[in-house]
Each structure stands twice: as structure tokens, then as C-alpha cells.
Design a protein with these regions (language model features):
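Catalytic cores and adjacent flexible loops of soluble metabolic enzymes
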Residues: 1-186
Length: 186
């Protein structure tokens, strides 16, 4: 073992073949392994890229997983990152018009820059499981709606659409009756 990372493309390999390959790499001392989900069609279409395989590979083999992307554009790579890909391999050319066997699905410099920006955005957007307002959202709580009495009411009078509204700011009772059904509001 060299101590260097090992990147293995999975193009057309069965789970049994991948298991044998990963096992051999680990038995040889590989500690830094990356499997690249690869579709061996050139160019690959988004429909035959099957990037949902990425989290499954990570679960099966307990290693980093990426994408060997032979599709046109950056969309498949962005989707792969959203599913947890940590490495993206993409063909590159200075000028697609110059030709070459992989020119049709290679990225030109501006497209490669877009790939970097958009995959970084996808990675950041993944975040973590979050419910309730984030720290950044706290200042927006005032824009939620609350129940407000909008007309003078007599004691015991029922709330109606004429005397009660759900309006901003959100500093009163929440408009969902589940939140105040048992409260003393009548």
C-alpha cells in the first residue's frame, strides 16, 4: 500500500465485483477509498445515470462515494452532490469545437467554473436536519400571522370572519385552532 487515496470507477460492475474489489483494496492496506458511480455510456443521459446509487454505495461499502460523470452539462453532477457525492470526475476541454472522442460531454472552462459553483451550492444547501426557525430566520418571525380582533366585541360574542383576522405581525395567537382550542379565548 502506498498510503495514497484510491479512486475506483464502478462502471458496469456488479455488487459482487465491487465487493471483491473493495475487499482486495482494504486487504492491501487502502484506508482512503473513493468509489465513483459511473455510467459507461458516452455521453450518458441523466435518465441512465442512476445517481440514487450513490448513498447506497456509501452504505454498502462504508467509504467516500462520488460520480464519474459522462453526461452533458452540470445537472447530473449537482444532483450527485445533493445525494452525498464528495468527488466529481468530469471530462474537460479548452474548446469543444476542436473535437475529440469525449468532446461532446466535456466541459469548457466557463462550464467547469459553473460546475464548481453549483456543486458547492448544492453541498451547502444539504445542511442538516432542521425544524423550527434557524438563527437566520428568527428576525422573520414577525412576518408570521397571528389572530387579531379587528372590531369591538361584546362579552360572549362569537368570533366571526367580520371580527377576527389572521394578520401580521405574528405576535398574537397562532391562526391554527389546534394551538388555542383549549385556551380561554371565548
Amino acid at each position: 500500500a502506498t498510503g495514497k487515496p484510491l479512486i475506483i470507477s464502478t462502471g458496469m460492475a456488479s455488487i459482487a465485483e465491487l465487493d471483491e474489489t473493495v475487499r482486495a483494496a482494504r486487504e492491501a492496506g487502502c484506508k482512503d477509498l473513493v468509489l465513483l458511480k459511473c455510467t459507461s455510456t458516452y455521453p450518458a443521459t441523466p435518465a441512465n445515470s442512476h445517481v440514487r446509487t450513490i448513498p447506497h454505495l456509501r452504505e454498502l461499502f462504508g467509504c467516500e462515494v462520488g460520480l464519474s460523470d459522462h453526461s452533458m452539462g452540470v445537472g447530473v453532477s449537482v444532483a450527485a452532490v445533493a445525494l452525498g457525492a464528495t468527488v466529481v470526475e468530469k471530462h474537460f476541454t479548452l474548446d469543444r469545437a476542436a473535437g475529440g472522442v469525449d468532446a461532446s460531454f466535456s466541459l469548457e472552462p466557463a462550464e467547469m467554473a459553473s460546475l464548481v459553483v453549483e456543486t458547492e451550492r448544492a453541498w451547502q444547501a444539504m445542511g442538516h436536519v432542521q425544524y423550527g426557525p434557524t438563527e437566520a430566520e428568527r428576525k422573520s418571525l414577525v412576518y408570521r400571522r397571528s389572530l387579531y380582533v379587528t372590531a369591538d366585541m361584546a362579552a360572549g360574542e362569537a368570533f366571526t370572519g367580520d371580527n377576527l383576522r389572521a394578520i401580521r405581525p405574528g405576535l398574537g395567537l397562532p391562526p391554527n385552532p389546534e394551538h388555542w382550542r383549549d385556551a380561554d379565548v371565548v
